[in-house]
Each structure stands twice: as C-alpha cells, then as structure tokens.
Amino acid sequence: MLKAIVTNDDGVHSRSLRALAESLASRGWDVVVAAPLGNWSGYSKSIGRFRGNRVYRFESRGVRFFTGDMPPAALVGTAIDIAGFEPDIVVSGINYGPNLGIYDFFSSGTIGGALEAALRGFKSVSISSACREEETDCLPEALSISLAVVETSVETLSSSAGLMVVNIPRSPRGFKVTRPCRRVPRFSGEIGEEGSLLVEKFDHSRLFSSEHDSCDGRLFSMGYIPVSLYKIDNGWIHPLDPSRDGYLKAVEDILNYKIFPSAGKQF
C-alpha cells in the first residue's frame, strides 16, 4: 500500500485538499492529512512560532488528520518525526491560486510544505490551481489532473529530481516541463490617512504574461500546465534545466500521455 502525506496552506477545511486526500484513499492509498487549522498562505517553509502547541488528531472518510495552529512545513515534520508516518510521497495541494516563479517558490506555504519533505529526502510535489476557494466548477478537472500527477510523481521522482512544482490553469492544453520565471513582482499601494500605508497585493499573472521566455508563468498564461523539477543536494535547491536533461522530457511525455494522449508520447 502506497502512503502519502497531504498538506496545503489554505487550511485543513479546504475542499480541494479534502477531495484530493479522499480520492487517494479511495484508490487504496494510506493517507495522512497534515494541514493547518487556518490559512497560512505566504509562510513559505517557516515552522512558525507555534501559536498553539497542540496537534489535534481525528479520522474522517478513511483519512487520518493532523492539524494545529502552525504552518504546513511544521505539520509535515510533525507527521513524519512525531507520528512516525514515513510516506512514499508528500503532496501539497490542491492550492487555491497559482504559485509561479522563483518569488512564489520562496513565499508559498504550499510549496514550503512540499519543500520540508524534499529536504528530508522524501519525494514531494506541490500542486496549485487557477481555481479560487469560492469556485466549484473547475475543481473536478484540477482533481483529475492532480491524481495523475501524484501517480506519476511517485513513480518518476528520485534523488536526482525529488521535488516537483505544478500549476494547473483553467481548461489546460497539456503539460510543459520548464523552469520558474525569474521576475520579481513589486508591492503597490498608497499613503492613507495619518501617514498609514495601504498595500495592495500585486497580480503577478500580468507580469509573466509579458515574458518572452517559456518559463512557468508564461506557459501558465498560455494555458499550459507548467511543471518545474528541483534537485535537493546537501540542503541546496537546484532547479533542473529541461534543455539539458532528457529525463525531464520523459516526465513531460508521461504526464501528457496520462491526461492529454494527443500531446504525449506513448509508452
């Protein structure tokens, strides 16, 4: 029986997280959800200050849950180190909203949960979607694609490529293995009353749509599912270059064949 830890930064009550965990369990996986009580978006691989020092355990629909008031990375570590659950893969997602480029790689709590596992030597994948929390129509497609990604990742990831980052747009055209975009978004805002600063979150999807290079954000804006792979070497994180590694092209072909047969090579 394959074993998986499922986490995210949107919280343990996220519909997309529960749909993914329950779907894996229904396929015979032994699943532990290790996700925060509330929203910890933007906390990266932080382990936090542990606003609560309790981790609560319960079981629902064949899935065991570990949750507490701490970020995803801390809960993944808790499930592995304290609960003693050693997974075949750690899946972080399905996140509401994409996580694109180097900036999101170092900011996203969802990617941080996957990175925590990768640093410990476990295969891990972060999955984000264009779907937002209030939307329901795009979740079934994102779930179907995510299940194929998990099944492929547990077979293909290795010590030479232990972390996969995936972003699913609406009505995707197929998978493309690529590298993360390098552009860094700027904060925007204005001076408010009494000198306060009103800061707005920048919609960086516009930033990447003007990229000339086929990095993840650019491909996402074109309707593709960008896939970036990383090697963890003695604690250092190395994004892999698809133009130099034939293995990455093989991963792309396998993913496309599972979901988009016309776009992939048959194996």
UniProtKB/Swiss-Prot annotation:
This is 5'-nucleotidase SurE. GO terms for molecular function: 5'-nucleotidase activity; metal ion binding; nucleotide binding. Its cofactor is a divalent metal cation. The keyword Acetylation does not apply. Its EC number is 3.1.3.5. It comes from Aeropyrum pernix (strain ATCC 700893 / DSM 11879 / JCM 9820 / NBRC 100138 / K1). Binds 1 divalent metal cation per subunit. A divalent metal cation binds at residues 9-10, 41, 95. Keywords: Cytoplasm, Hydrolase, Metal-binding, Nucleotide-binding. It catalyses: a ribonucleoside 5'-phosphate + H2O = a ribonucleoside + phosphate. It is found in: Cytoplasm. It comes from the Archaea. Pfam families: SurE. The lineage of its organism: Archaea, Thermoproteota, Thermoprotei, Desulfurococcales, Desulfurococcaceae. GO terms for cellular component: cytoplasm. Nucleotidase that shows phosphatase activity on nucleoside 5'-monophosphates. Belongs to the SurE nucleotidase family. Its main location: cytoplasm. The keyword Hydrolase applies.
